[in-house]
Amino acid sequence: MAGRTMQAARCPTDELSLSNCAVVNEKDYQSGQHVMVRTSPNHKYIFTLRTHPSVVPGCIAFSLPQRKWAGLSIGQDIEVALYSFDKAKQCIGTMTIEIDFLQKKNIDSNPYDTDKMAAEFIQQFNHQAFSVGQQLVFSFNDKLFGLLVKDIEAMDPSILKGEPASGKRQKIEVGLVVGNSQVAFEKAENSSLNLIGKAKTKENRQSIINPDWNFEKMGIGGLDKEFSDIFRRAFASRVFPPEIVEQMGCKHVKGILLYGPPGCGKTLLARQIGKMLNAREPKVVNGPEILNKYVGESEANIRKLFADAEEEQRRLGANSGLHIIIFDEIDAICKQRGSMAGSTGVHDTVVNQLLSKIDGVEQLNNILVIGMTNRPDLIDEALLRPGRLEVKMEIGLPDEKGRLQILHIHTARMRGHQLLSADVDIKELAVETKNFSGAELEGLVRAAQSTAMNRHIKASTKVEVDMEKAESLQVTRGDFLASLENDIKPAFGTNQEDYASYIMNGIIKWGDPVTRVLDDGELLVQQTKNSDRTPLVSVLLEGPPHSGKTALAAKIAEESNFPFIKICSPDKMIGFSETAKCQAMKKIFDDAYKSQLSCVVVDDIERLLDYVPIGPRFSNLVLQALLVLLKKAPPQGRKLLIIGTTSRKDVLQEMEMLNAFSTTIHVPNIATGEQLLEALELLGNFKDKERTTIAQQVKGKKVWIGIKKLLMLIEMSLQMDPEYRVRKFLALMREEGASPLDFD
C-alpha cells in the first residue's frame, strides 16, 4: 500500500500512552498493523498501531516518549506507510533494555525482580515493533519506568523451524516481540534502581582497584604479607560483581584494625589502601578530634562521618560506591566501656554510636573503617567482633628482607641522582639495623644525609656551603655507620648502656664454675635460637651475694647478640607502687614479644618482690605478675630467653617460683686458695712478689668470697703504700670472714 500524509497528534489517554503504540482512527488503519513513519528522507520509525474513536481521521497520535524519540511535534505532517516484518529474520531473540525510574520523586531502594519484569514486558508488548534507540514507558508493580532499547538480536531461524539452535546470532535494528523473546534489563547509568534476578545484564562496573595502581611502586617495604592478607580478607569480595556476591549471600568486610609498635607503617599502609581503591577520597580522622566539649556533639561527629555513605546507600543500594573512613589512634575514642572515670559517660556513648553505625540495625554495606592503634588491649571488645573491625592485622617490626625493602625505598632518589656512594651496601645496613622500625630506618637515612651535608659546610664566622665541594656531595658508608652508632637507636632494640655498667670490669674466669655457667648460658641461647619446640627458655642464676650473678647474666645476654635485650632491674623501679611495678614489668615483656628474638634479664628478684626476712614481708601482687610473665609463651614466630638472678633461692622455693624457670644454674663464690690466686693473676693488680706472699698464706686453704667483694677489697688495699698492700689485703679478707686464717 502506498504511503499517505498524516498529522501528528497527542495521545488521547494515559492508558494508551503506556501501550507503546501509535493511535489512529479505525477508518485509517486497523489495530495490530505496523506502520513506518518517515519524518525526513533519512529518518524512518516503525510503530505498531491501535485504534481509538477520539482520534480525528487523518491524524496519528503519539505519546511523549515516542514524540521525543522520533523528533515529532504536534501538528507536524508526516508520511505514513504500512510495514511488514520478515518473520524469518526480524523476530526478536534477545533484547537489551536500559531501565530507570520515570520520575525522580518516585525513587525507592526496593529490589525489583527482573524475571517478573521480563514476563510482564512480553505480556504487555507481545507482537509489537521495537527499534534500537526507542524510548517507551513501562508500568510494573504500580511504578512507572522509562525504558530505552539498547540492543536487539534476531531469533535463530532454526528455532523458528522447530530445529535445535544453530548458535548464529545477528544484530538487527528493528524487530518484532514474540512469545519466546528474551528481555534483559540494564540499569541506567547513575540510577539508584535496585535490580535482582537473572533477567539483567552484567553491569559495566567501575573497578574498585585504581587502574593506574602499581603494587610494586606502592612504597611500603616489609609489609607484603600483611598487605596481601588484608586484600584477601577485605577487598576480594568487593572486586567481584554485585550479582555474584548476592548469589553467594556474601557480606563485605566492614572494618580493619591495624595495630603494632609506633613507626612500623600503620598510617602509611592505610594511606596506600585509600590510594589503591578507585573510591572517593578517604575520610581521615584523628581519634581525639571526634571529642567535643558540648553535650552530644561527639556522637554527632561520628554520625557525620557516616552520613554520606548512608545517603548513597539509600539512593543506590548495592551499587553504592565504597566509602573509606580511617581512624588514627582509635583507642582514644573506643576504650572499654565503663573503664573511664567521670559521670558524663561521653566515651561510652561515642563507642555505642560507632558500634551502631558500623553494624547496627540499619546495616551499611558500602563502608570500610580502618582503625589504627598501638594499644589494641584498650579497645572495647564489641568493636572487634566479626561484622565490625573483624580483620585484625599486626604491623610488626620488619624482618631483614623488609628492612632491605624499606632502605631501598628511602635511598631510591639518592641512587637515581648518583648521590649514594658505591661503598654503601644496603644489605649490610639491613643486617645491622635489627629491630629498627620503618620510621627509624627513615630517620637513619636522614641522619646519614645530614652527616654528609655537614662535611660541606664551612666553619667560619658565617654559615656557608662550600659550593665547589657540594656538587660532589655523596652519602657514604661511613655516614650510615656513624649515624647508626651515634644518632639513631631502635626503641625495641638493644641499648648497650643498659647492661654495659654491669660488666664494666669484664668477666673474671677464676675457675671451672664460671666457665661452666657461661657454657650453659651459651647452650640456652642456642636452644632459644634453634628450637621450635621451646620458644620460651628461662634460667635462674642463683648463688650467694656478690658472686657476680648479674654480670654473668648480662654477659650471656650480650654474647647472644639478640636484637632485643632489656634488663628488668629494681633500681629502675624505686618508689613504684605495686601496680606501677607490675605495669613496668609487663611493658618490658610486651616490648620483647614484638621482636623475633628477645632476651629479658630479671635482676635481683627478691628486691623486685619487696622481700624482707623480718615478718617476713613480700608483694604478692608483684609475685603473681612475675609468675605469669615467666610462664607466658611469646606469640607464634617469636622467641624469648629469660635470665633471672637471686641470692635467696630458699625464699623463691617457698614462694613456688623455682618451678617457673626452665632450669637453675648455681653461681658459687671463690672457695679455695688456688681459685683466689687465679683471680688475682687475671686481675693483675698485685705484682708477682706480692702474689707469692699471698699464696704462702692461702694455698691449700679454704676461702669464701664473692668476686664482686674481692674486687672491692683489692681496690681498697691498693690505696695503701706498696709495702703495706698485701698485709692490708689479708687483713680485709679476715675481717670479711673470707678466710679462717689469722694473718700477721
UniProtKB/Swiss-Prot annotation:
The protein's assembly and partners: Homohexamer. Interacts with GABARAP and GABARAPL2. Interacts with GRIA2. Interacts with PLK2, leading to disrupt the interaction with GRIA2. Interacts with MUSK; may regulate MUSK endocytosis and activity. Interacts with CDK16.
Pfam families reported in the protein's UniProt record: AAA (PF00004), AAA_lid_3 (PF17862), CDC48_2 (PF02933), CDC48_N (PF02359), NSF_ATPase_lid (PF21964)
Encoding gene per record: Nsf
Organism encoding this protein: Rattus norvegicus
Name of the featured protein: Vesicle-fusing ATPase
EC number: 3.6.4.6
Compartment(s): Cytoplasm
Any single biological process term in GO: positive regulation of receptor-mediated endocytosis
Residue numbers binding Mg(2+): T550
Cofactor(s) required for function per UniProt: Mg(2+)
